[in-house]
Amino acid sequence: MAARNCHKAVYHAIELGHLTVHYLTPPADLQFGVYGSVHPADVAAALDAEPSAKCVILTSPTYEGVLSDVRSIAEICHARGVTLLVDEAHGAHYLPLAAQYGWQGGAVAAGADLVVQSAHKTLPSLTQTAFLQLNGDLADPA
């Protein structure tokens, strides 16, 4: 299951893997001309409609800075034994900021099972520096 506003690499992986995908369509924010956040209730309804789903993929924050409620979505996924992968490419700075300012961190702290972060977008690092963080035991590291 993937949000419609995911990075094109997600769609390439779906195609290359010959996977079946069911889409989560975040509402459009017409005032700003961007997609809004993926709502937890929409994820729950989609997983209820497709109980064979193995993974939910979403982007938070989006390129435009829109955040989804990753903690609630992680709880919904985990209650059903579904892996949550969050593309947090534009949120690699959340962990250091959370530690410094004492606020909730990003998708890792919120319980996502796999989190992709692009350090070169928001942190001082070499071009193309990225992390794939494995969190919990739902995702198989192999």
What would you call each of these model-derived segments?
Residues 1-142:
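Conserved PLP-enzyme active-site core in the AAT-like
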